[in-house]
A protein has these predicted regions:
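Short, well-ordered alpha-helices that flank and scaffold nucleotide-derived cofactor binding pockets
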Residues: 54-57, 61, 121-122, 282, ...
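Catalytic histidine-centered segment of alpha/beta-hydrolase-like enzymes
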Residues: 268-277, 281
Length: 289
C-alpha cells in the first residue's frame, strides 16, 4: 500500500469509509459512517476533513456523518474556479443528494462555516440545525472590520507572487496560522496533523485553491448580504474562541437567524476542535441530538 494511503487509513475513524463522488463534474472526496439523521461536517482553511476526527465517532453513534473535503482541499478536485461559498455549498448539497439524502444538519469551522451558512440560506427547507465555529460572515454587519484588519493580511494574499513565495514552503506558511491564531501554540494543531495538512495543500494547485477561498470574499459578501434579507429560522449554535473571534460572529449570526445560541469558549483560540476538544465536542453532540 502506498505511504500516502497508509497515512490516510491510519487516521480514518473506526466505522468510516473514504470515497469519491463526481458532483457536477467536480470530484469530491468524503468520509462517511454511522447511521441516522445526516450531519455534514465542513472544514476550514489549512485543514481538511481530517480535522473532524475527534467528533466523527461521537456523532456516528446517532447520525450518518458525512465529512467532505471542500473543492480545492484534501482529496477533492482543485479546479481553477468555483470557490465562492454559494458554489461550495452547492457542491456539498449535490453530494448529499447523490448519496440519497435531503435533510441535513450542518457544522462548519472557519471557511467551512461560510459554506454551512450558504447551504442553510440557499436550501433552508433541507437544513434542520447549524453549528458555526470561529470566523466571520462576509457581507454581514461590520464584516469589513475583520476583513481589513492588518493582522489578517492573508485575506488579501493571493496571485502569482504569493504563490511563488509559498511554493515548497507550505508548512512554513501554515505555521503562522496554526501558532499565531491559537491561544497556546502547544495546544494547537498536533504535529502529525500538521504533516497531513501541509502535504495535502502542497499538491498541484492546492495553495492556489486555498487562496481562492479568500479572493472570493467580495463575491461572498454580496451573496450573504442578499441572503441576510431573509432571516433563517432553524436553530444555530455558534462557538467561538475567547482569544479569536470572541462575540463578533455570535452578533453577526443574530443578524441572519432568529434562533441563536452562542458560546465563547474560554481559553481557546481559533482552533476549537484541537484547543478545546473536551468542551466543543460534547457541546456539538448535545446540540445536534
Amino acid at each position: 500500500m502506498p505511504a500516502r494511503a497508509q497515512k490516510t487509513q491510519a487516521h480514518l475513524p473506526k466505522g468510516f469509509t473514504e470515497k469519491r463522488a463526481n458532483v457536477d463534474g467536480v470530484n469530491i472526496n468524503y468520509k462517511i459512517g454511522g447511521q441516522g439523521p445526516v450531519v455534514v461536517l465542513l472544514h476550514g482553511y489549512t485543514q481538511t476533513s481530517h480535522m473532524w476526527t475527534p467528533l466523527m465517532p461521537r456523532l456516528a453513534a446517532s447520525h450518518t456523518v458525512i465529512a467532505p473535503d471542500l473543492r480545492g482541499a484534501g482529496g477533492s478536485a482543485r479546479p481553477p474556479d468555483g470557490y465562492d461559498k454559494k458554489t461550495l455549498a452547492k457542491d456539498i448539497r449535490g453530494l448529499v443528494r447523490q448519496l440519497g439524502y435531503e435533510q441535513v444538519k450542518v457544522v462548519g469551522h472557519d471557511i467551512g462555516l461560510m459554506v454551512a451558512y450558504a447551504y442553510a440560506a440557499q436550501y433552508p427547507g433541507e437544513v434542520s440545525k447549524v453549528v458555526l465555529m470561529d470566523a466571520f460572515l462576509p457581507g454581514v454587519g461590520d464584516w469589513k472590520e475583520v476583513w481589513l484588519l492588518r493582522d489578517l493580511w492573508h485575506f488579501h494574499f493571493y496571485g502569482e507572487t504569493p504563490l511563488a513565495l509559498v511554493k515548497g514552503r507550505e508548512r512554513t506558511y501554515f505555521e503562522h496560522f496554526w501558532n499565531d491564531f491559537a491561544a497556546d501554540k502547544t495546544k494547537s494543531i498536533p504535529e502529525a496533523d500538521r504533516r497531513i495538512y501541509a502535504a495535502a495543500y502542497a499538491r498541484a494547485n492546492g495553495m492556489r485553491a486555498g487562496f481562492e477561498y479568500f479572493k472570493s470574499f467580495e463575491q461572498d459578501a454580496r451573496d450573504f448580504a442578499a441572503f441576510s434579507a431573509t432571516k433563517l429560522g432553524m436553530p444555530f449554535l455558534v462557538l467561538t474562541g475567547e482569544k479569536a473571534s470572541g462575540t463578533f460572529l455570535i452578533e453577526q449570526v443574530k443578524m441572519v437567524a432568529t434562533s441563536v445560541s452562542g458560546t465563547v469558549v474560554k481559553g481557546s483560540g481559533h482552533w476549537l476542535m484541537e484547543e478545546a476538544t473536551d468542551q466543543v465536542v460534547p457541546a456539538i453532540v448535545a446540540f445536534l441530538n
